[in-house]
């Protein structure tokens, strides 16, 4: 099983709040079966499929998070998730 990891900065003004977390979870759900996503900040981690878990990380603008994706196609899945974060979750 392959595992890929990247560190990305939170760029949207409100950080990893409810709407941003929901967009991340929806993106994880669209990745398909067989992939596992974890998000870590400051030694705390959350399942990529958990809105509440992501919000509890308390990631604010300027913070960095580590995204780890494991499973078949993890490299492409990670690129999609990192792109979402770098795009500020589509927020202004």
Predicted regions, residues:
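Short amphipathic
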Residues: 2-12
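C-terminal structural segments of small proteins and small subunits
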Residues: 57-92
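Residue-level recognition of specific faces of alpha-helices
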Residues: 7, 27, 53-56, 77-80
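Beta-strand secondary-structure signal
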Residues: 5-7, 38, 64-68
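Compact, glycine-rich, soluble single-domain proteins
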Residues: 11-52
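Signature of N-terminal electron-transfer/Fe-S-associated modules in redox systems
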Residues: 2, 31-35, 75-80
């Amino acid at each position: 099983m392959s595992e890929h990891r990247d560190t990305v900065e939170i760029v949207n003004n409100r950080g990893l709040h409810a709407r941003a977390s929901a967009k991340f979870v929806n993106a994880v759900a669209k990745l398909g079966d067989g992939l596992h996503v974890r998000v870590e900040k400051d030694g705390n981690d959350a399942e990529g499929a958990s809105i509440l878990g992501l919000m509890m990380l308390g990631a604010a603008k300027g913070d960095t998070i580590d995204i780890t994706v494991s499973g078949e196609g993890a490299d492409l899945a990670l690129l999609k998730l990192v792109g979402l974060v770098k795009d500020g979750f589509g927020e202004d």
